[in-house]
């Protein structure tokens, strides 16, 4: 798979009982969806247990976020400039707690090129 571009879209929240996760999402992207589908299938084939939640491509901006009651996500999204991001490699990352802190450990990284 060749490198491709994705564009940021809106600000969102994943509601959690211990505090919300604030994120910025990406516009629909056929190459990103294809990459997700391939990776999901391969991981399942290799015995990984995966969430069945809907796929929401995003970058986490903050955890345990509490927005001011004066702010709403729609107006906040309009204030954030849109960014075009080149996807040229992917990393499979394990999230786990170490000494009570959420830690991200890269398991594998692959560069995207025509031979993938």
Predicted regions mapped to residue ranges:
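Histidine-dependent nucleotide/RNA phosphoesterase domain, centered on the 2H-phosphoesterase fold
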Residues: 1-116
